[in-house]
Amino acid sequence: MVLSANDKTNVKNVFTKIGGHAEEYGAETLERMFTTYPPTKTYFPHFDLHHGSAQIKAHGKKVVGALIEAVNHIDDIAGALSKLSDLHAQKLRVDPVNFKLLGQCFLVVVAIHHPSVLTPEVHASLDKFLCAVGNVLTAKYR
């Protein structure tokens, strides 16, 4: 998925609003994913999955931190997320469809917290970006 210059600008603008809320938005994204798609919980048998859980907050912060890293290296997402791709493909063996589900939940969280920012054009750019991240994270499964 190729991001245009306009897509990159849109994504960077959205993430200027998200950066300071990594833990909050990440936890909310994970909680939405676990509630909406219960099979995704199977990858977290050791987590307390209740609302407000310290483990959910910490992992949510890591998830959004990885997205921020991808934004900071938007011209080389594969390089920026290479180690994370290895981890998910070789050690954790996460079903690749879960990255799409997580991306959908993240879009909902952005829409809830920043409705005026998520215009149709920005929504499309952010979706393309999240698909690009998902593609990078699943590339080493092949």
Swiss-Prot record:
One of its GO terms (molecular function) is heme binding. O2 binds at residue 59. Keywords: Heme, Iron, Metal-binding, Oxygen transport, Transport. Red blood cells. Residues 2-142 form the Globin domain. Disulfide bonds: none annotated. Heme b binds at residue 88. The keyword Cell division does not apply. One of its GO terms (cellular component) is haptoglobin-hemoglobin complex. One of its GO terms (biological process) is hydrogen peroxide catabolic process. SUPFAM superfamilies: Globin-like. It comes from the Eukaryota. Heterotetramer of two alpha chains and two beta chains. Belongs to the globin family. Involved in oxygen transport from the lung to the various peripheral tissues. This is Hemoglobin subunit alpha-A.
